[in-house]
């Protein structure tokens, strides 16, 4: 269900020739048909969320094709022209290097980088936002970047919730409870849901849910009897908050609305939204 202000609406793309129009329409249809409530104050916030999701998906595919390597934190490496490898295996932005240039270099020179899946997901989030922000804004918000597991800049606002419906552009986690301790890095896999039943995970590539579970199961202890599984934990960029920084030069998606109800009362507690 999509709510704009106090109106429950069914949105649709009005310009079928705009970039990724079919993908955007699919996302809107999924959101409108889900039981989960997606609440926005304005249509511009919805447009930002839609474009953010598309950019997360395209950034995930770009990272997959960049040559970016999978390594444990003990074996991680980065381009020393832009980053310093920390003692724990993270990547610390060098002084006087614009974050926008350093993030873009990961996608341009992926073979010069290697790390684990959690860091890869954060890199994808930064790249998606860079596509929607002015470079000056991005550099101001995300100065002094550190790329390491789930350590991310405090100005990157994320929402993690349990339960809810899966939408393309969501970050979801596969858990492998009986992982072989010799390959503990395969205790789980952070992935971006690409839509059409495919996920991208750094280390496993672009695969279906069943294929990722199979890959994780291959890395269990001998005689394991518990299968890996897709958890119900979903992580998203808080598009409502992050939309404040969007570039005015970013083209807006043209969205029309079929009104369903215009007297909804929306209440949000934590990450749960209810409509009365």
From Swiss-Prot:
It is an enzyme of class 2 (transferase). It catalyses: L-glutaminyl-[protein] + L-lysyl-[protein] = [protein]-L-lysyl-N(6)-5-L-glutamyl-[protein] + NH4(+). InterPro entries: Gln_gamma-glutamylTfrase_bac. Its EC number is 2.3.2.13. GO terms for biological process: sporulation resulting in formation of a cellular spore. Keywords: Acyltransferase, Sporulation, Transferase. Coiled coil: none annotated. GO terms for molecular function: protein-glutamine gamma-glutamyltransferase activity. Signal peptide: none annotated. Probably plays a role in the assembly of the spore coat proteins by catalyzing epsilon-(gamma-glutamyl)lysine cross-links. Belongs to the bacillus TGase family. This is Protein-glutamine gamma-glutamyltransferase. It comes from Bacillus cereus (strain AH820).
């Amino acid at each position: 269900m999509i709510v704009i202000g106090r109106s429950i609406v069914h949105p649709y793309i009005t310009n079928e020739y705009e970039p990724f129009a079919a993908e955007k329409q699919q996302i809107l249809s999924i959101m409108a048909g889900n039981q989960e409530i997606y609440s926005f104050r304005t249509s511009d916030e919805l447009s930002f969320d839609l474009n953010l999701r598309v950019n997360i998906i395209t950034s995930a595919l770009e990272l997959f094709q960049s040559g970016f390597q999978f390594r444990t934190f003990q074996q991680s490496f980065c381009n020393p022209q832009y980053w310093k490898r920390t003692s724990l295996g993270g990547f610390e932005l060098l002084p006087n290097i614009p974050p926008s240039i350093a993030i873009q270099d990961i996608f341009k020179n992926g073979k010069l980088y290697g790390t684990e899946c959690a860091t890869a997901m954060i890199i994808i989030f930064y790249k998606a936002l860079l596509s929607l922000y002015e470079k000056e804004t991005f550099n101001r918000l995300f100065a002094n970047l550190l790329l390491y597991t789930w350590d991310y800049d405090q100005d990157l606002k994320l929402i993690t919730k349990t339960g809810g419906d899966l939408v393309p552009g969501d970050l979801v986690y596969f858990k492998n409870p009986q992982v072989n301790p010799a390959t503990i890095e395969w205790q789980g896999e952070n992935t971006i849901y690409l839509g059409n039943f495919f996920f991208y995970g750094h280390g496993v590539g672009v695969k279906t849910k069943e294929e990722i579970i199979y890959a994780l199961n291959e890395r269990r202890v001998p005689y394991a009897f518990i299968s890996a599984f897709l958890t119900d934990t979903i992580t998203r960029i808080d598009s409502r908050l992050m939309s404040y920084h969007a570039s005015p030069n970013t083209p807006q998606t043209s969205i029309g609305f079929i009104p369903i109800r215009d007297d909804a009362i929306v209440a949000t507690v934590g990450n749960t939204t209810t409509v009365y």
